[in-house]
Amino acid sequence: MYTLIIPAAGQGKRMGAGKNKLFLLINEVPIIVHTLRAFEKDEACEKIIMAINEQERSDFEALIQKYGIRKNVQFIQGGAERQDSVYHALQYVKETEYVLVHDGARPFVTNKMIHEVLIVAKEKGASICAVPVKDTIKKVVNDAVFETVERSQLRAVQTPQGFSVALLLEAHQSAKQSGFLGTDDASLVERIGKEVGVVEGSYYNIKVTTPEDLLIAESFLHVQRR
């Protein structure tokens, strides 16, 4: 069993929608509802904690009711940064020894991916899902190519990311004490010298971040429903 944390207090500035991107529609259903439905079907998910902007609480609650989400969903106040939201949410994890952290804007996560992440988290204490980088990656300095990075060992990291609650709490507390801001939760665990296991993600498991991503998400959904 695990508790799911969804940091959902972001403004989504790159989307340029003027509102929380999780409320935007894919095939007439809000992004966050697609995401919640993926975990709604998973019996191992004991509880969902969503760190939100308090001003949007009634909007989220209305979606839960409208779309019949039956899983136990708890709303808490999110922080200024994603990292702050996850740390705050960890204080409310009481029922399980393991936690998954997932981007609310990744609506195409699969049950297979969820459980592979959870299995490795139980084995190693921490796990991520990732896919090989397909593009050539270059390091650029002052608008000029500095070097081409060998991509064979590079991975594009996704969510969900899985952890023992005790380990993730230790990593967040260490980062907080040092004023360290990581790009994801796994980076905080790496920082304290702990191993993070890797499982195969999916190129379909996109994070809907820009208007172009909305179009891609629509096409993915149509393919899934054929």
From Swiss-Prot:
Q: Which SUPFAM superfamilies match?
A: Nucleotide-diphospho-sugar transferases
Catalytic reaction annotation: 2-C-methyl-D-erythritol 4-phosphate + CTP + H(+) = 4-CDP-2-C-methyl-D-erythritol + diphosphate
Q: Its domain of life?
A: Bacteria
Q: Name one Pfam family in it.
A: IspD
- Pathway per the UniProt entry: Isoprenoid biosynthesis; isopentenyl diphosphate biosynthesis via DXP pathway; isopentenyl diphosphate from 1-deoxy-D-xylulose 5-phosphate: step 2/6
Q: Kindly list the GO molecular function terms attached to this UniProt entry.
A: 2-C-methyl-D-erythritol 4-phosphate cytidylyltransferase activity
What's any GO biological process attached to this entry? Answer: isopentenyl diphosphate biosynthetic process, methylerythritol 4-phosphate pathway
Give the record's family classification. Belongs to the IspD/TarI cytidylyltransferase family. IspD subfamily.
Matching PANTHER family? 2-C-METHYL-D-ERYTHRITOL 4-PHOSPHATE CYTIDYLYLTRANSFERASE, CHLOROPLASTIC
Put simply, this protein is called 2-C-methyl-D-erythritol 4-phosphate cytidylyltransferase
